[in-house]
């Protein structure tokens, strides 16, 4: 039976990060770098790293519980759990592990992989289920443990990444607080940023071989990714604003994927968004992929800076290459 269409609102957020952190001075003991070199080029001062006993599912579950508590929603009332990640504990996915950990026994759970764009892509996916009336309460988790796939001898990339998780609760609402969005992908640029599988032939019979191997560390063309981000992100934000019938001046907060402070500054400058409206916590977390947006959102909300009704322009961008933006109002 066709359900009645409805709006949606973001009603709670939460986050989690491993206890262990590694600052730039500590990193300089591992590779030839320095705090000044890293901070001046990336804005990063420290990053949280998952230890041997930390799991992505554990971090995701903590973030989820914090978001549910803020939204005043019971886990048993959830209809759907979406996990945006590229680094699950289980290659088949970790959303069901989070479902079990928080006791969301009635919720459907599955992973969504869109790298650093994953949280925005996940938000729009969740919105379709709510807007069509299929589900009313959705938990969206963005979590990554990129330290598993970093080459800790490569000073160009190992300085960038950290581990963490963030989550939001999206609920059916009479007034639709998701005002507009735009999503894009360009597979022709895949080689700019990837974690490639590398296998070797293993003979099964005289005529049949299979490939067995593992994934290689993160490979990134930093200059191309920077050029891509500073050109495409302002475009997609403006496209989402146009769909929302809003202008840049209507934005209360610009919430970008925390990839590099230089990218945040360049995008804000192109959009003519003042620095005081740009949310940034990259100094303490680094690039946590799908977790950056909800991590930064949660910190800003809990500091009391984001108020009910504030308009937030969020944009994720990264491997694929993929990029997207969502314009939404904070409900709580």
Curated annotation (Swiss-Prot):
Organism ancestry: Bacteria, Bacillati, Cyanobacteriota, Cyanophyceae, Acaryochloridales
GO biological process terms held by the UniProt record: fatty acid biosynthetic process
Main location class: cytoplasm
Family matches, as InterPro entries: ACP_syn_III_C (IPR013747), ACP_syn_III_N (IPR013751), FabH (IPR004655), Thiolase-like (IPR016039)
HAMAP family for this protein: FabH
Location within or outside the cell: Cytoplasm
GO CC terms, sorted: cytoplasm
Species this chain originates from: Acaryochloris marina (strain MBIC 11017)
Gene3D superfamilies, alphabetized: 3.40.47.10
Alphabetical list of PANTHER family matching this protein: 3-OXOACYL-[ACYL-CARRIER-PROTEIN] SYNTHASE, BETA-KETOACYL-[ACYL-CARRIER-PROTEIN] SYNTHASE III, CHLOROPLASTIC
Keyword Cell inner membrane in annotation: no
Pathway(s) the chain acts in: Lipid metabolism; fatty acid biosynthesis
Subunit field text: Homodimer.
Gene Ontology molecular function: 3-oxoacyl-[acyl-carrier-protein] synthase activity; beta-ketoacyl-acyl-carrier-protein synthase III activity
Record EC number: 2.3.1.180
UniProt region (ACP-binding), positions on chain: 258-262
UniProt keyword annotations, A-Z: Acyltransferase, Cytoplasm, Fatty acid biosynthesis, Fatty acid metabolism, Lipid biosynthesis, Lipid metabolism, Multifunctional enzyme, Transferase
Originating gene: fabH
Catalytic activity: malonyl-[ACP] + acetyl-CoA + H(+) = 3-oxobutanoyl-[ACP] + CO2 + CoA
Membrane-spanning residues: none
Protein name: Beta-ketoacyl-[acyl-carrier-protein] synthase III
Family per record: Belongs to the thiolase-like superfamily. FabH family.
Function: Catalyzes the condensation reaction of fatty acid synthesis by the addition to an acyl acceptor of two carbons from malonyl-ACP. Catalyzes the first condensation reaction which initiates fatty acid synthesis and may therefore play a role in governing the total rate of fatty acid production. Possesses both acetoacetyl-ACP synthase and acetyl transacylase activities. Its substrate specificity determines the biosynthesis of branched-chain and/or straight-chain of fatty acids.
Location of the active site: 116, 257, 287
Domain-level remarks: The last Arg residue of the ACP-binding site is essential for the weak association between ACP/AcpP and FabH.
């Amino acid at each position: 039976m066709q359900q009645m269409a409805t709006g949606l609102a973001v009603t709670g957020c939460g986050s989690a990060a491993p206890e262990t952190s590694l600052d730039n001075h500590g990193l300089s003991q591992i590779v030839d770098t320095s705090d000044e070199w890293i901070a001046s080029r990336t804005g990063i001062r420290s990053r949280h790293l998952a230890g041997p006993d930390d799991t992505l599912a554990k971090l995701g579950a903590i973030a989820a519980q914090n978001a549910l508590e803020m939204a005043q929603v019971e886990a048993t009332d959830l209809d759907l759990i979406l996990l945006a990640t590229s680094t699950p504990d289980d290659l088949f996915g970790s959303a069901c592990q989070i479902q079990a950990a928080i006791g969301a026994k009635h919720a459907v759970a599955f992973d969504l992989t869109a790298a650093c764009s994953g949280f925005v892509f996940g938000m729009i996916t969740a919105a379709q289920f709510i807007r069509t009336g299929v589900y009313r309460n959705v938990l969206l988790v963005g979590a990554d443990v990129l330290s598993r796939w970093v080459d800790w001898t490569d000073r160009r990339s190992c300085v960038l990444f950290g581990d963490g998780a963030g989550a939001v609760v999206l609920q059916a609402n009479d007034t639709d607080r998701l005002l507009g969005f735009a999503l894009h992908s360009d597979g022709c640029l895949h080689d700019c940023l990837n974690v490639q599988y590398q296998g070797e032939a293993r003979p099964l019979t005289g005529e049949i071989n299979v490939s067995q191997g593992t994934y290689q560390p993160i490979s990134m063309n930093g200059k191309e990714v920077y050029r891509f981000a500073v050109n495409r992100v302002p475009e997609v934000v403006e496209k989402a604003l146009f769909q929302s019938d809003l202008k840049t001046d209507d934005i209360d907060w610009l919430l970008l994927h925390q990839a590099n402070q230089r990218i945040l500054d360049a995008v804000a400058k192109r959009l003519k968004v003042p620095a005081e409206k740009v949310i940034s916590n990259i100094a303490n977390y680094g690039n946590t992929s799908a977790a950056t947006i909800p991590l930064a959102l949660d910190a800003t909300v809990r500091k009391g800076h984001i108020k009910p009704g504030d308009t937030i322009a969020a944009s994720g961008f990264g491997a694929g290459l993929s990029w997207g933006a969502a314009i939404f109002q904070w409900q709580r």
